[in-house]
Amino acid sequence: MSQPQNTFKLNDDIHHIPMIGLGTYNGAKVGEVGDAVKVALKSGYRHIDGAAIYMNEKEIGHALKEVFAEGEIKREDIFYVSKLWNSCHHASLVRKHCEKTLEDLGLEYLDLYLIHWPIAFENADPSGTTTQPLRDSDGEPVLAAVSIRETWQEMEKLVEYGLVKSIGVSNFNVQNLVDLLTYAKIKPAINQVEVHPYLSQPNLKYFCDRYGIVLTAYSPLGQGKCDLLSNETLKSIADKHNKTVANVIFKWLNQRGIVTIPKSSNPARIIENFNIFDFQLSNEDMDKINSLNSNLRTCTPANFCKIPLFD
């Protein structure tokens, strides 16, 4: 991948991740995510964040094929991220599901592959061909006797095989990372977690900085479940810079050294969200935004299991 200006260097000192990308979680309509990817890439984005469990990587693959066929944007210009789902942690399944993702996308390699959550479920299919978990009589996923160490060792092999350039994790807390760093031959390049002004994650950020792990912020606007966009402090800062509140939040993240991956299917908003490289927030602006933290989570595992990972 060529190195665009607005990137963060990863801890291998070779690869760089663009500061802002397009999130692709939960496209409601067929074609919606593919159209969003095309708009984003043609508007300057070079970072697309996906996952097998989003069930739309074939659609993204078709969009990438169309864009590449036009000739102006090449595969090496794009930083594509995908994730290994919880029911695919067994050593025998990691490569299989990475290759399935590559097949769906029509790509030969991933720029970054993440363990989606620090929890393993048994696979519903004995041959492990699905992302669906085996469920108990209460409908809850059955936990698998698979350690993060076992899964991480297989992730490291994906780098050796040339299937992925970098590997990382998602939704890992400090304790998860401390354990991982004791045995990792390849350190995680990224930890992707929820970060926004109401959940600023200063302690996790400090730890990740200390060990060379870049944070990526998902749900930077709180998934629309809180009043970030109408917050008076954020609105006043946005007015001062003649920017949107979303622009201010994304800039606040980037100035903290955090990648952000806002999701939108609205073409105008996709373009507007990228408009963060022509202004700077002052120290006073940053302090005001930092003061909004209330440790409010909008994303928990409750939508797929009853395990309180963040308690």
From Swiss-Prot:
Catalytic residues identified in the record: Y54
Alphabetized SUPFAM superfamilies for the sequence: NAD(P)-linked oxidoreductase
Catalysis performed (reactions): an alditol + NAD(+) = an aldose + NADH + H(+); an alditol + NADP(+) = an aldose + NADPH + H(+)
Regions that span the bilayer: none
GO CC field: cytosol
InterPro entries (UniProt xref): AKR (IPR020471), Aldo/ket_reductase_CS (IPR018170), NADP_OxRdtase_dom (IPR023210), NADP_OxRdtase_dom_sf (IPR036812)
Domain of life (superkingdom): Eukaryota
Binding of substrate, residues: H116
UniProt keyword annotations, A-Z: NADP, Oxidoreductase
Family affiliation: Belongs to the aldo/keto reductase family.
Protein name, as recorded: Aldose reductase B
Organism: Dictyostelium discoideum (Social amoeba)
